[in-house]
Amino acid sequence: MFSREEVRASRPTKEMKMIFDVLMTFPYFAVHVPSKNILITPKGTVEIPENYQNYPILAIFYVKYLMKKNPYDLLPSTVNWPEPYVVVNTITKRFQDHKLFANKNADVYVERLQNAIASGIKIPESKKNERLGQPKKTKNVTKEIEETFIDATNARKELDEYFRKLQDGTLTGDLEGGLCKVKTLISCKALFGGHTQELQFMATNVRKVWIGEIVCGMVSNKNAIDDNDLEEEERNASGEQTTTAREESEALDTTSNGLDALNTQINAIETEESFWEAIRALHNELRTSPTQLEECRKAAVFLLGHKKILQTFTKQKDTARALFYINLKECLGTSWNLEYTEASDARKMAIKGELQN
């Protein structure tokens, strides 16, 4: 029989218990066979790679880490080994976080441990925080390309060359899988030359088309709602209304309040003269504001009861669109073709641009 003193002496010290915990000595077992450079475990045999052969403790720790991570799986025949310094960082972190060092400095123990099990391993300064179990952070390197065209003399030629470089990959050839942000600044004078008056016409026509589309869209939505209400009334007259139909009718009634309620909320347009005056005011505005949307709604309410004026307004909108295309063609020349084609490879893009006098 062992005496009490002998039993007490055979127990591991606190420092040894800490080492057992950090290196996961139990309950995971791995036998190192130096002659064959393998590790034999209850879950399979693992071959030690060359960069771990001089550091068997690191190899054993990593294999035990895999067994702990997947307790119900066998070890794969081909193990994906990290760099040795990643395992060293993991062991160091486990030392520093151990409860034994709650009020102590672990640096002395860490230095002694590294000299014992990882002597000669250099840890890059930028990799000191890389440990096992951390998701790899991928950083997309964004290449910024900025071009500015302000000279009206050679602008067309320079733009044609610029788009050609984008198309053939000259500007984006060294991305190495990263992202590319292209920023192009083209002055109106460089792009349109002396056609500043045409540019003003284009801006005015764009404004007319935009206002026209908003007003006509509101009119179309109201007409669609009214058509649905009419069908609902016919179903009510024939006695074929169902519970679902009643719910739909209530929803349509709620939606149709959008334009009708504006007659009581804002001053409605009552005459044709006031309608065209409101439209001209919208065309002359240089900036957008919430009040302009209300004016568009008033115009839409007026057009709902004046179909002939609606037809005239629609024709004017279409004419403005046609004039915009004509002005654009005159400013840019006989051909302006810009096409974008998406590709699976971030380094590739298809951009075609042509400028001709």
From Swiss-Prot:
Entry keyword Cell membrane: no
Top-level taxon of origin: Eukaryota
Lineage: Eukaryota, Fungi, Dikarya, Ascomycota, Saccharomycotina
Sequence segments annotated as region (Disordered): 226-257
Database matches in InterPro entries: Rep_fungi
Protein name: Trans-acting factor B
GO biological process entries: plasmid partitioning
Keyword line: Plasmid, Plasmid partition
Function statement: Plasmid partition require REP1, REP2, and a cis-acting DNA sequence (known as STB). REP1 may act by intercalating in the yeast nuclear matrix and binding STB either directly or via REP2.
The species this protein was found in: Zygosaccharomyces bailii
Pfam families linked to this entry: Rep_4
